[in-house]
Amino acid sequence: MDYSEIMVRHGELSTKGKNRMRFINKLKNNIQDVLAPFPAITVRSDRDRTHVSLNGTDYQPIVEALKLVFGVQALSPVYKLEKSVPLLVTAVQDIMTSLYRDGLTFKIATKRSDHAFELDSRELNSLLGGAVFEVLPNIQAQMKHPDVTLKVEIRDEAAYISYEEIKGAGGLPVGTSGKGMLMLSGGIDSPVAGYLALKRGLDIEVVHFASPPYTSPGALAKAQNLTRRLTRFGGNIQFIEVPFTEIQEEIKNKAPEAYLMTLTRRFMMRITDAIREQRKGLVIVNGESLGQVASQTLESMQAINAVTSTPIIRPVVTMDKLEIIEMAQAIDTFDISIQPFEDCCTIFAPDRPKTNPKLGNAEKYEERFDIDGLVQRAVSGIVVTEITPEIVNDEVENLIDALL
């Protein structure tokens, strides 16, 4: 027998009361986005399950994709069949025969939500267990911790049989906690911050600053590839490329070297906040980790934050670098992040950046700039691209390989 579908059990969203169906529908949409590369798949949801019908598709890549989607508590490959006792008997016998090995223990666990069905749960357990003994007389039944628990569900629309339960990613469906702008440089930290924001249901749009010719097409492709990795956890992500060359040249020419990083980050924060307001986001997310680099001391954060009253979420702020690296490896972004392309935070980086910049000094140096004009021109020049889980071709990978 081949699996008919993957049955998805919902996570934290099961506690969301009146908003339950909104959460479930969002999870369904996210699953559809993530499974877009598999056109035969169909998805439907009810109040306590989402059903992913395979329609002949190999189940293993579908399971691997679903394991990453936030809002999924657990999933099981299942056999779906008509609610017929003879069909159930045959299916249970076939499944257990295929699983049998010497010394195997099992139990039947039946759940009946269709109370019009001819047998109750206890009767089904007895009947189906007896059917297994008919074809496997040496198998042993065991009620506590058996090797195989064969779950049989009798629901209104059909019967379902499964024996495997696979842990999901947990968390909340992406998009159920509002929208935020992720400042993604291309380094190790910001993709991890994005992953953790997605886990709490935040719908992120990626803001990436590009300064050609100082930053290369490879750096841009790298940031887009990192964004594509993040789509595996909740579906499509808008990638916003911000032209930043003019601003960085202005800062380089007019500001003291020690304040280059502080002023650069202040402009990035202003621009991200303007984009957030334009695109109706609620928060800004970044990959700052306290004390890791000069711009991430408390004094630096205070001087940079002063340009906005928008909440700033820093998911990795208390994590050690090794912890961040381990998480980056676990979510498969690390190998991309360490590709050697310059980004806007590393070009023009001073040898001795100010670790305790004074807000008053930063504001005084910024009097040399047309701040509103620079920000407005950057925001008006953004390029928005929708990044999807589906890779139509290997253009991004080929570009990066060619440039390395």
Swiss-Prot record:
It is found in: Cytoplasm. Residues 60-165 form the THUMP domain. SMART domains: THUMP (SM00981). It is an enzyme of class 2 (transferase). It catalyses: [ThiI sulfur-carrier protein]-S-sulfanyl-L-cysteine + a uridine in tRNA + 2 reduced [2Fe-2S]-[ferredoxin] + ATP + H(+) = [ThiI sulfur-carrier protein]-L-cysteine + a 4-thiouridine in tRNA + 2 oxidized [2Fe-2S]-[ferredoxin] + AMP + diphosphate; [ThiS sulfur-carrier protein]-C-terminal Gly-Gly-AMP + S-sulfanyl-L-cysteinyl-[cysteine desulfurase] + AH2 = [ThiS sulfur-carrier protein]-C-terminal-Gly-aminoethanethioate + L-cysteinyl-[cysteine desulfurase] + A + AMP + 2 H(+). GO terms for cellular component: cytosol. ATP binds at M183, L184, H208, F209, R265, G287, Q296. Disulfide bonds: none annotated. Its main location: cytoplasm. One of its GO terms (molecular function) is tRNA binding. GO terms for biological process: thiamine biosynthetic process; thiamine diphosphate biosynthetic process; thiazole biosynthetic process; tRNA 4-thiouridine biosynthesis. Pathway: Cofactor biosynthesis; thiamine diphosphate biosynthesis. The keyword Mitochondrion does not apply. InterPro entries: Rossmann-like_a/b/a_fold, ThiI_AANH, ThiI_fer, ThiI_N, THUMP_dom, THUMP_ThiI, tRNA_STrfase, tRNA_sulfurtransferase_ThiI. Keywords: ATP-binding, Cytoplasm, Nucleotide-binding, RNA-binding, Thiamine biosynthesis, Transferase, tRNA-binding. Its EC number is 2.8.1.4. NCBIfam families: tRNA uracil 4-sulfurtransferase ThiI (TIGR00342). Catalyzes the ATP-dependent transfer of a sulfur to tRNA to produce 4-thiouridine in position 8 of tRNAs, which functions as a near-UV photosensor. Also catalyzes the transfer of sulfur to the sulfur carrier protein ThiS, forming ThiS-thiocarboxylate. This is a step in the synthesis of thiazole, in the thiamine biosynthesis pathway. The sulfur is donated as persulfide by IscS. Belongs to the ThiI family. This is Probable tRNA sulfurtransferase.
